[in-house]
Amino acid sequence: MKINFEKYPDRLAPAIVQDAATGKVLMLGYMNEEAFEKTRSENRGTFFSRSKQRLWTKGETSGNFLDVADILADCDSDAILIKARPHGAVCHMGSDTCFGETNRLGISILEKLESTIA
């Protein structure tokens, strides 16, 4: 798989992380070619921190790693989808996702049905 990092002036492609089991979007990060290759070789989500200007592996300080199940490129090969198995909270603020959503298998359908009926 080839990602078109050259499309972006900073050579950082958006990387959407999705829970491999629930399908819930967990976070958005950015990858340069080095982060992409490290993620592929180690099967752990590694990104490029725009604020720290360095690679960081999700969970390197918290222990909440993202084990990679699959990596896909979009139709233009300029965006990355990572299907992962999270170990604990994904957001640095302590929530399941960086979008403030709960990430649980199965129960979400029942919760949606309940809110629709109520």
Regions found by a protein language model. Name each.
Residues 2-14, 20-21, 25-26, 31-118:
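C-terminal binding/interaction regions
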